[in-house]
Amino acid sequence: MAAPPRTALVLGGGGLVGGAWMVGVLQAIATETGWDPGSADYVIGTSAGSMVGGMLAAAVPPWLLMAYGSGEALEGLPGLGGSRSNRFGASLQIHWTFPRPVLASPELALRSLREPFKYGPAGIVAWLPQGMISTEPLKTVVRQVVPQGWAAHPNLWVVAIDYDTGERVVFGRQGSPNVDLADAVAASCAIPGFYHPVDLQGRRYIDGGMYSPTNLDLAAGADAELVICLNPMSSRHRGGLLQPSGPIAAFFRGDNRRLVDREVLALRRKGKQVLLLEPQADDLRAMGFNYMSRRTPGRVLACAVRTATASLRGSKLGADLSSLPRGRADRLSRPDTKPSSWPPKLFPPGLQVA
């Protein structure tokens, strides 16, 4: 019998709402196909995908992320006791500071003038003032699971951008700066003009989505034959003029879709199999226009589970994922017993049962 293919799971950006969509899709994959997304040989996360991927790589199963995202009471688990602060919106607690009315990155702004096509969106946002919202709440969420250091997963890559040079940095990959996972995720999520840049070892970092919505091209350097990519920021569906799936939204999603399509084609030319999952029409209606909305994730989670399950059933996509080694039962679906009785093996050290 041939060995199963080595896998890379690529999770793109998309704010709080995109993160909720990815969690719902990952749960559908686990329950419908029997494959544990956290068992991927590589996990590559950008922006919201770095938060979700970091949790998976730290051994948090999708069903627990579902419970966290919906704010469900899980008595007996530190930090997951059911208060409103446990919703996805906890990562957007507002810690304001007022920026100076100057360029956030004068060095990158000047570089973008000399080479206007080299830096993409990062070169444009260099001209904005610095963001006003602290990333500390993001770090707090990660530290609940990984208090310090990196996740135990051998190949968790977190993508950010050096805000002064415009260069892409892949934390967790060999040769990259050695930082805590909480700091790397905060850097990857630091939307310019919204969040503060994250200072690490004398450098400032911003959202890795300023290079690519998924950074799917990094999978070319991964020792993996099968690449599974979830991209909340693209879709093949169009709706009415002012709907989230309509032509106005499609215009903004179009660039993301075309870039990801080019990345997919490049990987396939290298002999890799690529499975791309994107929001369906119902998902787009649930997601709305505001990807940082704290009111939307609950309904997005439920919708994503439903639409992804329907897409997987009887499809080649579902068959390809079902052919992968089956995950442990308690990683695929939630135990029927009370949370306080769940075995410690279910959780990373930061989420042990009290």
Regions found by a protein language model. Give the residues of each.
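Patatin-like phospholipase
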Residues: 1-46, 51-354
